[in-house]
């Protein structure tokens, strides 16, 4: 299947660009040299195997040997791994399952935390620094605008459904209904106990 090599090559290119370009990250990279990290994403049949060497990281779709560390998680958790402060929290909450040498994933998260993921760096060799930075700002601004627009439309839809069209109850109506239901339940319980007492006499 040609899709698998395309995905692994794309991820490999991104990781090598951000993690192996800067000489300042050399000490963090040496801790991972010779290590194999396997990332299994729930919902995906193909694991990603990261093989670290002195000059690059190789991303493979399969690995015959045994990985030093295997990480099992959801794809939505991967962006959180850029912050090394969250690693312990993710493991405790069960969002991230680590098998094998935990030091490997700790070193990888530390390296990712030190690396600066800036899309302008990818564009700079082709467009120049100023144009790349300008394009990056426009893209970030556009993404922020779209995110806020989506959240606003979500709010509008929720208000229309609950307030205008009355297709669903509002939050206060739900709370009132829950209180009334609890009151009826308490009344039925007290009536049941009174009836049981009367029947016992």
From Swiss-Prot:
Keywords: Cytoplasm, Ubiquinone biosynthesis. InterPro entries: SCP2_sterol-bd_dom, SCP2_sterol-bd_dom_sf, UbiJ. Disruption phenotype: During aerobic growth, mutant is impaired for ubiquinone biosynthesis and for growth in rich medium, but it does not present any defect under anaerobic conditions. Mutant is also impaired for Salmonella intracellular proliferation in macrophages. It is found in: Cytoplasm. Residues 15-112 form the SCP2 domain. GO terms for biological process: ubiquinone biosynthetic process. Pathway: Cofactor biosynthesis; ubiquinone biosynthesis. One of its GO terms (cellular component) is cytoplasm. It holds the Pfam family SCP2. HAMAP family: UbiJ. Belongs to the UbiJ family. Required for ubiquinone (coenzyme Q) biosynthesis under aerobic conditions. Binds hydrophobic ubiquinone biosynthetic intermediates via its SCP2 domain and is essential for the stability of the Ubi complex. May constitute a docking platform where Ubi enzymes assemble and access their SCP2-bound polyprenyl substrates. Required for intracellular proliferation in macrophages. This is Ubiquinone biosynthesis accessory factor UbiJ. It comes from Salmonella typhimurium (strain LT2 / SGSC1412 / ATCC 700720). The gene is ubiJ.
